[in-house]
């Protein structure tokens, strides 16, 4: 499992400040994973510089501690760590949570550019459907631990089929077109200890 982690699949957690060690310099946190996987020390040091260039941070910032970086820079640093061993798959768990919309946009553009340049795949986990249309080719909608709908991104946004997907689509405002009243999803999430039979969403179907 250790050989698999970071070399075949890596993860970007939703809170960069919590994901980073507060008492280690960023440089050490990037090189640590490479050294653990047998990369030569000098090669790891150069790779850390290259990774910071890649994610748009001045290499001089490698000697900073996490609290000395802005939220957007910390998120980029976490992405750099995740890419240290060039994994073909990157899991991103709410990578733009707690960032303002301008920084969110910059991070998403950075991720898209890196994916084009390096050719890795992304499993992007989020509750914000507006982010998915920016970055995804295919989308799976989960409710209470089950995938209730999956489709190509454009198809899902233009013609959602499942009532839960429709509820999600109606619960956030559109930035274009006529004004529409936002509609919440009635009811409460199910008790997963004793879930309803059949589709777990059926007690909330309107």
Report residues per predicted region:
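Short helical segment in ABC ATPase nucleotide-binding domains corresponding to the A-loop/adjacent helical element
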Residues: 17, 23-35, 45, 49, ...
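Short amphipathic alpha-helix in the helical subdomain of ABC transporter nucleotide-binding domains
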Residues: 5, 44-48, 62, 169
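Short catalytic/signature loops enriched in Gly
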Residues: 55-58, 62, 152-206
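P-loop NTP-binding/switch modules centered on Walker-like glycine-rich loops
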Residues: 87, 91, 95, 99-181
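Conserved ABC ATPase signature
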Residues: 65-69, 73
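ABC nucleotide-binding domain signature
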Residues: 2-3, 7-14, 78, 123, ...
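ABC-type ATPase nucleotide-binding domains, specifically the catalytic core motifs of the NBD
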Residues: 1, 28-43, 56, 68, ...
């Amino acid at each position: 499992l250790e050989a698999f982690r970071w070399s075949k699949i890596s993860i970007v957690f939703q809170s960069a400040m919590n994901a980073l060690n507060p008492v280690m310099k960023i440089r050490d946190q990037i090189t640590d994973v490479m050294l653990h996987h047998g990369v030569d020390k000098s090669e790891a040091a150069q790779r850390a510089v290259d990774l910071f260039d890649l994610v748009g941070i001045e290499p001089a910032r490698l000697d900073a501690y996490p609290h000395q970086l802005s939220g957007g820079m910390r998120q980029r640093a976490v992405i750099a760590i995740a890419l240290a061993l060039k994994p073909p798959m990157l899991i991103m768990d709410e990578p733009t949570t707690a960032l303002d919309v301008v920084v969110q946009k910059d991070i998403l553009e950075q991720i898209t550019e890196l994916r084009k340049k390096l050719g890795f795949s992304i499993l992007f986990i989020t509750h914000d459907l507006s982010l998915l249309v920016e970055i995804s080719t295919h989308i799976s909608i989960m409710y209470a631990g089950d995938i209730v709908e999956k489709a190509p991104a454009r198809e899902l946004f233009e013609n959602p089929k499942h009532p839960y997907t429709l509820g999600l689509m109606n619960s956030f405002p559109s930035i274009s077109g006529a004004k529409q009243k936002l509609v919440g999803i009635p009811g409460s999430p199910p008790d997963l200890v004793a879930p309803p039979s059949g589709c777990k969403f059926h007690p909330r179907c309107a």
